[in-house]
């Protein structure tokens, strides 16, 4: 509709809008009102993508941009999490996310976090399924391994060094399985448009993501920081590309 109104080429057949919608849905709590994803979708497609020139021109991940917009605008709705347990009951239970409980010093169930029997957004509850999907994308060479691996490893090292729990492997596993890390590392940070294309750039990008996520999680006011870390690093991609792009042999020599 926007492209028709602005007399632009119609690109709906490339399915990029559908992919953005799917990723946005994975970033939402399971019981949000229907108008929340509608507003988020409009923001992602029109504000983040189309206003900057359409597919390939957006400076940050559209789904994450919409998620942050919704968090700022409708914080109460976006942080109201509920889930149905695996025990067969259909009564939703409202609770804090595991990362929020962990930050408050409470005990969390690592097995439930790994399998997905816990509160959170749709795409951050089952670390197991996200890992399977991420490994599949890497095996099929749809995404590079550099960004997700460097991201997860760097965050893990940051947590061990600055998490205040020493080398507690259980605490480390809880940090890695909780929140949007797996979703962000494999499905959001690897977006072709908003991530570096050079191998060195992808490594630097992943390391920066891990450091920023660790800072936001451990020292910030919120228990989560994946979305903000990815968006911030999206803004640094041009600089990362400039620094890590190899100079052509002989460039700058005498003519």
Feature-to-residue mapping (PLM):
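Cytosolic-side transmembrane-helix boundaries in multi-pass membrane proteins
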Residues: 218-255
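Long hydrophobic alpha-helical segments that form multi-pass transmembrane helix bundles
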Residues: 56-131
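C-terminal ends of transmembrane helices
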Residues: 1-9, 45-56, 130-141, 186-195
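Alpha-helical transmembrane segments and their membrane-interface exit regions
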Residues: 1, 42-51, 67-72, 154-159, ...
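Hydrophobic, membrane-inserted alpha-helices
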Residues: 17-26, 41-48, 129-137, 153-159, ...
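Structural signature of hydrophobic alpha-helical transmembrane segments
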Residues: 31-40, 113, 117-127, 169-181
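Membrane-interface helix-loop-helix junctions at boundaries between adjacent transmembrane segments
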Residues: 12, 16-17, 22-90
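Loop-to-transmembrane alpha-helix initiation sites
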Residues: 59, 63, 172-180, 202-204, ...
